Amino acid sequence: ESITNTDRPGLQALIKNSGLTGKTVSSTNVSFTIVPRINAVGRLGLSEKSVSLLLTEDYDEAAEISSQLCVDNSERQEIERDILEKIDGIIRRKPSLVNDKIIVIDGENWHQGVIGLIAAKVKEAYGKPVIVISKLGDIAKGSGRSVEGFPLCDAVFACSDLLTHRGGHPMAVGLSLDSENIPAFRRKINEFADNFGKMPYDKINIECKLNPAYINLDLIDSLSLMQPYGAGNPTPVFGLYNMTLKNITPLSANRHLRLTLSRNNIQITAMKFFTSTEEFPYKIGETLDLAVNLDRNEFNGNVSVSVIVKDIKSSDCDTEKLLDSRTNYEDFCRGKQLDRSQLSDLMPDRNDFALLYRYLKSNGGYAFETATLVHMLDNRLSFGKIKVILEAMRELRLIEISEGMKTSKISVLPVNGRVDLESAPIIKKLREVF
């Protein structure tokens, strides 16, 4: 309320330039619209602009600085997109990087003010601790983000002999080291993770299951009593289960999606930001589970409920089983000894090969996250088994595969004659240890 009714010229100008004039400023608006503009200039090394904006008593000066902050924030976003594209390319060229328990990715001259934000986004994509390192000649600086339950600072401190500076807390770290020590650092920090025990995955804490019939402005008004949200008081996340997908509408040049969903004749719309139709694997008619935030949306004087999708999965997906299977595959790739049940989870037979190959051929390949293939094949193959088959088919030149942060591109190649599936190196390796 104090921000909505502020008499500070800087905040007034920033509210106007953020498109919030005449609206009630919520903690969500502050977190995702106002604060990023203030933080952006600090990340770009121009923090004096934010200080001047907040201290000025002159509205004209505030309006000018606020406009600059919006431009700087757009520049920060462009820098982030550029680095994320480079990281996606690195992962596509060397997919084994993401088999590590702690993902360590490095690049040349990445802007050090944003690598922490980048680490957080890569962590969201893979559900693992991530450290992003920027090399500036012989010196490198890194920033990391962890998942709940894994003390990333302890892992970093265990590598102190390779570092020139380090600091942080269980969920975030910063560090410096000589560029030549990055490979040794990657190995050593993953040795720490290997000795840690079962690694936790990133997770979303659901406050409660929500009946879509109760999504209305009265609920939003009740939730507003818990604001402001932030550190120590996170925005509540609700679970919408067994929702039927009715329609998919691309927005903003296909950068975002509006989903129409229903259950028991109750229909709602939900926003899936930063996802295009090409990246969305689900089809109309499928039954989905969603983790969502709820907020008030004000537009042209109309007030409605905004449902924002944080994550989405098929209702028939056994997430724990899928993650355990992913761990089995990654441990196998890293040479870790597996027991017989874990190996059985990975070992395919000819029928398994045929099932996946027929699916890929009949659909002209595949262009979504590999994990969603489990659902597309009606849970007949485990995630680990799918990964083994894909790698075997790649080795035998049956397919080409490029796996990035958000999507996998699988293309079926022309084949002459019969192919001996048992000759694939990954199958031979599995047979040896089985």
Per-region residue spans from a language model:
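Mid-to-C-terminal polyanion-binding domains and interfaces
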Residues: 61-65, 71-105, 158-434
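Hydrophobic helix-and-loop "lid/oligomerization" segment in the mid-to-C-terminal part
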Residues: 1-184, 251
